[in-house]
From Swiss-Prot:
Heterodimer of HisH and HisF. Belongs to the HisA/HisF family. It is found in: Cytoplasm. This is Imidazole glycerol phosphate synthase subunit HisF. Coiled coil: none annotated. Keywords: Amino-acid biosynthesis, Cytoplasm, Histidine biosynthesis, Lyase. HAMAP family: HisF. Its main location: cytoplasm. The active site is at 11, 130.
Amino acid sequence: MLAKRIIPCLDVRDGQVVKGVQFRNHEIIGDIVPLAQRYAQEGADELVFYDITASSDGRTVDKSWVERIAQVIDIPFCVAGGIKTIEDAEKLFAFGADKISINSPALADPTLISRLADRFGVQAIVVGIDSWFEQETGKYWVNQYTGDETRTRQTHWQLLDWVKEVQQCGAGEIVLNMMNQDGLRNGYDLAQLKLVRGVCRVPLIASGGAGKMVHFRDAFIEAKVDGALAASVFHKQIIEIGELKSYLVQSAIEIRSE
């Protein structure tokens, strides 16, 4: 059985790490490089960087910080934001990224997933999915352009249909960003994760809602996710990664040890 992964997420805007609640009202957390170094030293298995306004601004990731990150950390990292072409991806890999993640551009053109997977291999291509639970209908919808709240829109895709579609197109991994839970620290949406797990054959990463160590344990044991991504609990040192890993080991969860 593959070890479960603990993945700090760094949302980047204008060269700084920021964090919002339900993808809104972002506050500045700090500079990218020191935070990335801290997480690598604390035992993170990998890092994810989202240039959150790249897609809505119509640009690609600011590459200046990607190269700096690659120079100072020795764990894998994934970069996302406005990647629309093979050339965009090539530049990020050349600067040192281990994986790239696409989200809004894949919704605009699902063939992008296939083209990237064919060129770089499925193991390097992650698809991020921003889901929203609509209480009135009881349906999970996929949202687009969530980095800019003035441009965020609900697509015609229901969540499970899009999960199936991206796998057929060649996604090597899926990060499920559960927008209703984002930043609230009330726990991951286990019901939603279980639904997605039922149709997801590739590694599934939970994102949105971690507030306590038990939330990670529940996602791994109950929803059988492959990794758990979190931001504010790590940024604000509510949870320390080493302590989290020790706790998970005591819960009989296989974790990568240092």
